[in-house]
């Protein structure tokens, strides 16, 4: 019995040059997720506060969100992105610091949109917390 050798050549994805991108920021109370996409919505890269080395309650700090945004800006620069449109979702503490970090990374921010989902009397919210 001869063994077949799998020719699984690990090919790196070819980085295409993109001028404009969208930064989706999901800022929850526990974590901040930053995703860079192209204009069609295809994901190019992402970073989170938890993935940046912060655990527990430190994930929900503005500094952790800033570090995640800086990680994401390096990914965007690999693709050659110059202009960013920012979409912010959620009420978390990392909203402002993420936008400031992306701005200071050298991107030209074209517009900032708040896309936080607001129910028009949808589902009943959970009961109030009593501590």
Swiss-Prot record:
Presence of keyword Repressor: no
Source organism, top-level taxon: Bacteria
GO MF, one example: structural constituent of ribosome
Cellular component terms per the entry's GO annotation: ribonucleoprotein complex; ribosome
Gene3D superfamilies per the UniProt record, alphabetical: Ribosomal protein S11
Pfam families: Ribosomal_S11 (PF00411)
Coiled-coil segments on the chain, per record: none
Biological process, per Gene Ontology: translation
Entries under PROSITE patterns matching the protein: RIBOSOMAL_S11 (PS00054)
Record keywords: Ribonucleoprotein, Ribosomal protein, RNA-binding, rRNA-binding
Family to which the UniProt record says this protein belongs: Belongs to the universal ribosomal protein uS11 family.
Function of the protein: Located on the platform of the 30S subunit, it bridges several disparate RNA helices of the 16S rRNA. Forms part of the Shine-Dalgarno cleft in the 70S ribosome.
Subunit structure and binding partners: Part of the 30S ribosomal subunit. Interacts with proteins S7 and S18. Binds to IF-3.
UniProt-recorded name of the protein: Small ribosomal subunit protein uS11
Native source organism of the sequence: Wigglesworthia glossinidia brevipalpis
């Amino acid at each position: 019995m001869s063994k077949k050798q799998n020719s699984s050549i690990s090919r790196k994805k070819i980085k295409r040059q993109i001028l404009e991108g969208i930064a989706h920021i999901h800022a929850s109370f526990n974590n901040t997720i930053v995703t860079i996409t192209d204009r069609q919505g295809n994901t190019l890269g992402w970073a989170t506060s938890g993935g940046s080395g912060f655990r527990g309650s430190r994930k929900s700090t503005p500094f952790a969100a800033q570090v995640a945004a800086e990680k994401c800006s390096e990914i965007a620069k690999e693709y050659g992105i110059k202009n960013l449109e920012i979409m912010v979702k959620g009420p978390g503490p990392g909203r402002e610091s993420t936008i400031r970090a992306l701005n200071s990374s050298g991107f030209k921010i074209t517009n900032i949109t708040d896309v936080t989902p607001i129910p028009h009397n949808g589902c009943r919210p959970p009961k109030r917390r009593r501590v």
